[in-house]
Design a protein with these regions (language model features):
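Membrane-inserting effector segments that mediate pore formation, membrane fusion
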Residues: 91, 96-124
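Terminal, membrane-proximal amphipathic helices
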Residues: 1-91, 129-188
Length: 188
């Protein structure tokens, strides 16, 4: 009998499944590389007219968002499982997680520390926002503020590139699912 799209093979992690502890380790490592000081320097360059207190507050909000990413991902996986949508959601989250785990990306955390995770967090949040655009909201979370906040910090050029990465991932997953469904219909 052919495997259904949302069934996992025994003993195998589903496609795109990344250990969230790896993402938490990346966050911890980035915090160790310059911590808040490096993040505040980055923000000061992006927001040159901001007062010191505003820069510090922006850094604190940034860290809160970054620290929330593993929770967002875990909750999205859980929701996908509960709704039988793992064949769609897991590969999309896998793309976002792989970007998060790349040390050298558009804003490399290997060089920038915590500031290098701003683009990663933006990409995850934009992925979740796109999942909410279906016929029924996926998580129904209001992620507009964090997305806009991070877009301000990463800049429009990088944000556009990240948005394109999300759209490309969605198109890839759609093509893969169409191919799978075609094969399944031929097997039936």
């Amino acid at each position: 009998m052919p495997m259904q799209p949302d069934e996992d093979r025994a003993g195998e992690a589903p496609f795109g499944m990344t250990n969230l502890s790896d993402i938490q380790a990346v966050i911890s490592s980035a915090k160790a590389r310059g911590g808040m000081e490096a993040l505040e320097r980055f923000i000061r360059r992006r927001l040159p007219d901001a007062e010191n207190a505003e820069v510090h507050e922006a850094a604190e909000v940034s860290v809160e968002i970054i620290d929330s990413i593993p929770i967002f991902l875990a909750r999205a996986r859980q929701e996908a499982q509960e709704r039988g949508l793992t064949s769609v959601v897991t590969p999309l989250l896998g793309h976002a997680e792989q970007y998060f785990l790349q040390p050298m990306d558009l804003i490399p955390e290997m060089i920038q520390g915590l500031a290098g995770l701003l683009d990663d967090a933006y990409l995850v949040i934009r992925t979740l926002q796109h999942l909410d655009k279906g016929p029924e909201p996926f998580l129904d979370w209001d992620l507009v503020y964090p997305a806009q906040f991070l877009r301000t910090l990463v800049g429009d050029d990088i944000a556009r590139k990240l948005d394109a990465i999300v759209i490309d991932a969605m198109q890839q997953v759609s093509a893969q699912l169409n191919e799978l469904w075609q094969r399944m219909s031929h097997d039936a």
